Amino acid sequence: MMNQLPVKAIVLLLVIVGFNILFGIDGVALLDPDEPVYAETAKEMIRFNEYLSPRIYNEYWYDKPPIFYWLLVGSLKLFGGFSELAARLPASLMAIGAVLMTTVSAARQFSARAGFWSGLVMGTTVMIMYMGKASVTDTTLLFFMTGALLCFMHEKYWLMYLFCGFAVMTKGPIGVVFPGAIVFLYLLVTRNLGRMLRMHVIPGLILVAAVGMPWYVFMYQNHGMDFIYEFIGFHNISRFSAPLHPNRVHWWFYLPVIILGLFPWTGVLLKSIKDAVTKSVGRESTRLLFLQIWWIFVFIFFSIAKTKQVSYMLVLLPALSMIIGWNIERMTCENGKCQTGWVIGTFVMYLLMGVGWIVGGRQMPELAMGGMILGVATLVLGALNLLALKKYCNVESAAWLHVVTGLVTMVMAFGVLMPQIQDRFSVKTIAATYMAAEKDASRVLYVDRFLRPGFMLYTDIPGIEADVNSEKSLDAVKQDPRQKYIVMREHMYEKMKEKMGGENWELLENKSGICIYRSR
């Protein structure tokens, strides 16, 4: 098959992937704490008419460069103000763009069928389904970093540097460090460092700086060392050397992230990685080697880093998707041959996920029925996959059943399950309750640090931050002689109520574990 994807194939791909990513983005409140942070910052850019220095709670802060905020600002203005749809649409479109780039690149590097399947794999994973619906920076970084690395594969070096510059403007130095390290390791392993002479490295880095540096210079000139200490020190260096979440500091943390995040394709992942080494030849094997270095570097780097975030694994998704897509296309040429590795992997993963949905749903009463339905559907689809792979040895049928599994999982998760439990993970409802209630205007308001971005987003009231994990912070709340309210999570109140003088507080409202308390 020619390496040019037919228009019909691209349209079909965009319909499937677009549905998987866009469905339900306006049906669930923004989830605390990460999503509200970005939407609120964009709101404040508009409110203060200042688009270079980000603010939150009406004060400057130095968490991320501005590109994602600008995308949010454009979306909020387009839709006439804040809504869940306006806040999530930019991240969703960047995710779809990254899938499309991966598809086109794989088609040109391998074959049209390999490209088509690479896009379907990437676009129907649990990871892209979830992250593509989240109003956070990660899919924007994914778009630019994927663009940079794929441009290297296609020897489009000037475009590669341009993508790196935009990646730096999305999430900082990692935008050029990661592509640079992956490319260098690949050239080193293939003993082709001489290729760097054709890559215009020095002028290319100047282009990266021309795109990425002006904002940093502006921020330093206007905010001085506060910007350097917080952005470079805390949000970049410190996150590598010190854990943001101490309970996640395990070398194996990202293994379950990949296993669950690549579902429903996890069952064919190990086989594809192995086959890319043992069953590829010529230029194909060299291209696959680059993809192997890509995902291995990302996995090892973040496994070493002290701060662990699920979203960090998103950057390796294009590489693994292209490897799987290549292998699906290769295996379709072997129809009639039993793919034992895929059979075993599918049996294990579908069984685990099916049982997991059923058992997990029972942990929350509102999810019991939905979890049961999704669990049974997963087990049935797993059985059909085994039938296609084991009895009929039909690779393409099995692959399409995987696509169906991804879509069914997404529709159930975001059409049924998440709307039922959103109040457990979003302050939106309790914020509306606070705004509607009769309040004593003389009382001050404290807000749980975890909930504060969302509370500000949905009320425009910043409140006073209470770090409910800090005894010192809660003691300050206790010592404040004024009458007060505090919005915090129920389980944190029960854990820390002695530190904040629990006998002096009474519960006003409790919405799925997020509460308003009032001092007596």
PLM regions: where:
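Membrane-embedded architecture of ER/inner-membrane glycosylation machinery
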Residues: 2, 158, 272-520
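Membrane-integral, polyisoprenol-dependent glycosyltransferases
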Residues: 1-338, 360, 456, 505, ...
